[in-house]
Amino acid sequence: MRDPLFKGCTRPAMLMGVPATPLAVCSGTIALLGIWFSIAFLALFPVALLAMRIMIRRDDQQFRLIWLYLRMRWLSRDRTHAFWQSTVYAPLRYAERRQRLRKP
């Protein structure tokens, strides 16, 4: 294997046992709900933190996989989805590929 991928290199940054990005999104949403409606919404933070810690107990990439699923199934509405009713993780345009193959 020429370029090995080490598991530690792909691990997300953790705060309180939860990846930093989902924690920031969740705590920001709860804080906004607490500001707009009632301070009682802030009591949801420990519950949300516990739920997120339970979710990533087996796999620390779980939130990345959930985001990828949502992006592929619900947010990606390209020509491939319109024609085949499917999604593509990394579509490759045929014209670009053909031009790259022609160049010496």
Swiss-Prot record:
Main location per the UniProt record: membrane
Transmembrane segments: 30-50
InterPro entries recorded: T4SS_VirB3/TrbD/AvhB
Top-level taxon of origin: Bacteria
Localization per Swiss-Prot or TrEMBL: Cell membrane
One CC-aspect GO term: plasma membrane
Signal peptide: none
Record key words, sorted: Cell membrane, Membrane, Transmembrane, Transmembrane helix
Membrane topology (UniProt): Single-pass membrane protein
Pfam families cross-referenced by the UniProt entry: VirB3 (PF05101)
Family membership noted in the UniProt record: Belongs to the virB3 family.
Protein name: Type IV secretion system protein PtlB homolog
The species this protein was found in: Bordetella bronchiseptica (strain ATCC BAA-588 / NCTC 13252 / RB50)
Gene behind the chain: ptlB
